[in-house]
From Swiss-Prot:
Pfam families, alphabetized: CRCB
Membrane topology, record value: Multi-pass membrane protein
An annotated GO BP: cellular detoxification of fluoride
Name of the protein in question: Fluoride-specific ion channel FluC
Organism, as annotated: Escherichia coli O17:K52:H18 (strain UMN026 / ExPEC)
InterPro entries attached to this UniProt entry: FluC
Length: 127
């Protein structure tokens, strides 16, 4: 149990730092859409999709790696709370269209990236 807790801790910290770096680099590029948060959510959705696809086929993988990558890293990287706050900020500024676009792109994009990862993994392992 301690190994699993440490894996979540290490993965979560690493994912959080990655999210912060993405936000620092990309959020200033566009005033209405926080591109760093979007990138974090899309990358995290892709990684978790690939992870779940891989772990479902590779049943001998140590559970420590599973929680390090999915619960830890992807949990720290992706951020529904920051995304939600940014949508509220856009609404408070009267930017309804940008707020709706942000919701649409984050949600649909995350679903699409997860599905893409599953598809790519399946295609690459089909023999």
């Amino acid at each position: 149990m301690l190994q699993l807790l440490l894996a979540v801790f290490i993965g979560g910290g690493t994912g959080s730092v990655a999210r912060w770096l993405l936000s620092m680099r990309f959020n200033p590029l566009h005033q209405a859409i926080p591109l760093g948060t979007l990138a974090a959510n899309l990358i995290g959705a892709f990684i978790i999709g690939m992870g779940f696809a891989w772990f479902s086929r590779m049943t001998n993988i140590d559970p420590v790696w599973k929680v390090l990558i999915t619960t830890g890293f992807c949990g720290g990287l992706t951020t529904f709370s920051t995304f939600s706050a940014e949508v509220v900020f856009l609404l408070q500024e009267g930017r309804l269209g940008w707020a709706l676009l942000n919701v649409f792109v984050n949600l649909l994009g995350s679903f699409a990236m997860t599905a893409l990862a599953f598809w790519l993994f399946s295609a690459s392992t089909a023999h």
